[in-house]
């Protein structure tokens, strides 16, 4: 097995699921990655492909950065498709930099924050498929340097509680709870 896939499998095996939903999603991602290198191919739709995303945190305030995704019309963490990295953390870093304009992003930890498998509706010639999302926590010291990318309606900082309300989905709530536990910050 290629070393990138093996490294991801090792990281997934080391990641403790918080609940039955995450346990199921982790198993699905492990099965996809173990099945072959197509797991990183954004054109692999059955069932889907690995993506990398990031919950970006302001080092000083503990606020989290979300963008209002133009196509999906929802508040989401930053992230997206593998562009040849074959490493969801590197994908998350690249996507977060592209989508926020923040150049100083660094991982809070190299460990996985959360995993989630979610359905993407058909659009732009792509069929409905699943994103097997591997999520990380990134930190910035320059929160005022954000620049909204074209794929976003809005880009904004929220407390962890506000972010949970805006995202309004169990996987995000779980990731935000983990983020709070990893940091000394208290949303307010």
Describe the role of every protein-language-model region.
Residues 83-174:
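Unchanged
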Residues 16-53:
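Acidic, metal-coordinating catalytic segment for phosphate/diphosphate chemistry
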Residues 173-188:
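Charged phosphate-binding loop/patch that engages nucleotide di/tri-phosphates or the phosphate backbone
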Residues 41-77:
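N-terminal strand-loop-strand
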Residues 1-28, 100:
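Predominantly extracellular/luminal regions of secreted and cell-surface proteins
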